[in-house]
Amino acid sequence: AVRDGLIPNVFSADGNHAYNSADASLWYVWAVQQMLKALPDRKGLIRERCWPVIKNIIEHYGGGKVPFVAPDAEGFLSVGNPGTQLTWMDAVANGRPVTPRHGQPVEISALWYNALAFADSLAKAFGEPEWRRTKQLDAMRSVFFKRYWVTDERGDYLADVWRDGGVETCVRPNQLFALSLPYPVLDEERYASVLSRVRRCLLTPYGLRTLAPSAPGYRPLYEGGPAERDEAYHQGTVWPWLLGAYGEAVLRAAWDVPGSVRELLRTIRPLFAQHLGDAGIGSVSEIFDGDPPHLPNGCIAQAWSVAECLRLLHLLKEAAPGIYAEWEANARKGGN
């Protein structure tokens, strides 16, 4: 189903798949990384089945062969125009994108860097030097910091979108991917300030808000008719799937891993102790209101919510098995 470097973002039974996403192909690369982590002895399979696809993606994205993606002189990707919605924040209301993110969205830049860095490592392992990008990667890290780093009276964080002539400085969770991906584009000494801002503005017991409450356009509740709900979908509404990236970033930045694991388990306790008995019984909803009490909404059993919550638990168990076992035992007894 790969076509001109693009992975479908929607599969159709009749074969007319949708290819209107800038990030699906880059998430494919991440999925291959997860497979390699889980099955380190299957590098031969990756070379045979996945490596050609990854090279196809990089060739088309980096060569300007994807209609809505254009590489710039520094190696980053500009996507879309004011009338498109090509990232996961893709809601449309009254014929216009609710969350315009044309230009260089921070997670697209992070995913692209991660894809290039992974390809560089595979090219080294497979003896294909023509696919190595070491010098380009070093330069991209410096450019990324200059473009996206924001300092205001409340601290430092990463802008959500960079465009020629300015940046979107609203605080959104997409900046987490610059820390959490296998090859992070942000330098390690910057992690703490980003996480501090995300924790203060976006973190809830059920996931992360899509926009800080102090921002213009913040919608505290997911309610009303279709247009009103679409207006709120990525404008403050909480998404559980983002907990995976948040937990990964916290663990990567942690100087006290056991303490960080305990903090994360305390934070998500209501999600597992209370929510699993609400909405879709035994499952995790798609979204929650941005404001307390964070009522669940959307799909009552959402695959990506479940998947990333399970991945987070796996990461925490791997990082501190004893602490996780204690938490799990208490959870089964109904304790805290």
Name every feature range the model reports, one short phrase each:
Residues 1-336:
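Acidic, mature catalytic/reactive cores of soluble proteins
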